[in-house]
Design a protein with these regions (language model features):
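A conserved beta-strand-loop-helix scaffold within acyl/acetyltransferase catalytic domains
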Residues: 1-104, 118-119
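Short low-complexity, flexible loop/linker segments enriched in glycine and/or proline
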Residues: 35-36, 144, 168-171
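Aromatic (often tryptophan-rich) hydrophobic motifs at membrane interfaces
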Residues: 63-167
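Acidic/histidine-enriched, glycine/proline-rich intrinsically disordered or flexible terminal extensions
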Residues: 172-176
């Protein structure tokens, strides 16, 4: 869509979007991005982990690839993504951005465009995914990807295993 193209262009003009190391993410105050991102979440019971726990997890994560979005004028980190790679796919495992910059610099548009271009065109992965829809759906990222970047839903079969006695109760109450 043309509106999406304009927002991507604006983001690429205003922002520097690149792969960064886990240490760069910590040093460039990635935790502040995480902390401020939680402000926009619909589920107010959702709170970020502590800074020390987050930094330890990021420092020890040597398997993921990290991307950062920096404002060109100031060099400030305003968004980041943590991606896990497995086989022929890339999972955009966690994307965070500071809400106050979202409607001025459109960091998510540029970030998604650059990551998708890089992984699908340059690195030749078969597909990218944003993972599974959460029960709380606190961020709305799936709807954003479907509407703006023409992602699609890929449904999967869910198999639930119960304790034997609970399974009997479920089958009696819901015979489907």
């Amino acid at each position: 869509p043309s509106k999406t193209r304009n927002m991507v262009r604006r983001s690429l003009k205003d922002c520097d979007i690149r792969i960064i190391s886990n240490i760069e993410l910590i040093e460039d105050n990635g935790y502040d991005v995480l902390d401020k991102a939680y402000i926009r979440y619909k589920d107010k019971n959702c709170n970020p982990i502590s800074r020390s726990t987050w930094e330890e997890a990021i420092r020890n994560d040597l398997k993921s690839e990290f991307w950062g979005v920096y404002i060109k004028e100031t060099g400030k980190l305003i968004a980041y993504s943590k991606n896990s790679i497995g086989g022929l796919r890339v999972n955009y495992a966690s994307m965070k951005s500071i809400p106050e910059y979202m409607n001025k610099h459109y960091p998510n548009y540029g970030l998604l465009y650059e990551m998708t271009r890089y992984y699908l065109k340059e690195r030749k992965y078969r597909y990218v995914t944003d993972g599974y829809r959460s029960i709380t759906e606190h961020s709305g990222i799936q709807d954003f990807l479907i509407k703006r970047f023409l992602f699609r839903k890929a449904y999967c079969r869910l198999t639930i295993y119960y304790k034997w006695w609970f399974g009997i109760a479920v089958r009696l109450l819901y015979p489907f």
